[in-house]
Amino acid sequence: ECSSAASDVYKRQILPNKVIVADSIDSNSSTTKNIDSVSGSDKIFDINLTSNMSEILKNSKTILWNGPIGVFEKEPFQKGTHQLAKTIAGSEAFSLAGGGETIAAINKFINKDEVSYCSTGGGAFLEYMEGKLLPSIEALGG
């Protein structure tokens, strides 16, 4: 039953309708574009979290977050990750966050205690969530 429900979740892809583009990562100016207007030469540095995305997160029972959705270290490109962090913090879901950049974003935008579980491990965190046995855990007898 669980794998059937999980399969249904994986079939659904929610994409942003607007993205933030700029000439370079060091640019102080940016432009918001509809996703359909993005050209091959545009450099996307952030996305706008849609109300649909926020609603799905707010109604989720579990949220797994791995990786920021924009270049959150730079002012014009941090809005998407900031919105994501605030939405997760405001959710009643059990939330898991993994990866050094994700934890840095959490520390920048919200209180770490607003996330149920944080791990600085990125790839290892995801592998563990997949049920893979990690060498370090195995060495400890786990």
Specify the residue positions occupied by each region the protein language model found.
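C-terminal functional extensions of proteins
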Residues: 100-142
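Charged helix-capping and loop-helix junction motifs
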Residues: 77-86
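Single conserved hydrophobic/aromatic residue that forms the stacking wall/gate
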Residues: 1-6, 10
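A short helix->loop->beta-strand "cap" motif at the edges of active sites that frequently abuts
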Residues: 11, 90-94
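Active-site rim loops that border cofactor/substrate pockets in soluble metabolic enzymes
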Residues: 11-76
